[in-house]
């Protein structure tokens, strides 16, 4: 008959009463209540002591020689309250400089102090490997923002499929490029962008949708080969929210005009079709006035970028306190005994890691935050 956990006090009282009655020996009473003789003698001795013998006694040791002194805990807590974004390592580093003769607790102990005081909250993170989409981005000057997209699939009269890639300046509406390509793969698109960058310089940012070759669904932050290259060039890559083409509305409107004027009827072959695209681009930029531009043509508003296309791709520069890791040939980095997959398009590249909370690290490629990861679970969080 084991004691009921729901009411241990009553069971202890019944045990003592059975001993006092003289009907049971200690051994018999312990067997009857399903406890050991050691436990039985413990409660009998406490009964003999008198007051409050039924109550549980604290198991806390009388002294804790390893406990962090209260004054040290106070230093940690006060510094954290003054700098709410600092993690344990940064707090300890600053405290060691301010109090060089003081023995400070370990990083894990510091984290425990902060957690006990309610100064660490579990980070709210989006556990999704797909890019969440970027709201519409405003432009105020030419080259603040370029937009790029493919306008579907078309077929020439000789039966060849082709895909129009278009690049436009958001502010001036200038159609920078309209190329008929045989595929939407990045290896076809990159030469178009290289030519445009050589002739016109670099924009501050490029806005695209989430389709290939601009995004890769199974890579962290959707990093495609084009996206990685643009980061290296210092170009911000924004993507519209999935299913919301209206966030790239000006480009979509231009596409409707291009489809009507440059694809109907289709060209006899790809060479003929490209001539039709060139003629449309000239008319759109040089001839057609735009009401939103005060009835000016895009060519009257557009100017080339002052940012030249570099001969050599600049190397990333990271802060001294960052942890650096080289991406393996299969797109992983090794950190804290875990292998984290980022993107096969980053192979051989160096990324930087910065701890932003206890066990939570931000991963940067150049100056772009590409992901966050949890060193405890081994999860990468987009």
What are these regions (language model features)?
Residues 51-147, 153, 224-227, 245, ...:
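Basic, flexible linker segments flanking DNA-binding modules
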Residues 1-14, 62-70:
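Short, Lys/Arg-enriched anionic-surface-contact patches
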Residues 70, 108, 112-168, 172-174, ...:
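Mobile-element integrase/transposase regions
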Residues 184, 197-220, 241-243, 248, ...:
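Acidic/histidine-rich, metal-coordinating catalytic segments
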Residues 7-24, 73-82:
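Short, amphipathic alpha-helical "recognition" segments used to contact nucleic acids or chromatin
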Residues 285-382:
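C-terminal, beta-rich DNA-binding module of retroviral/retroelements integrases
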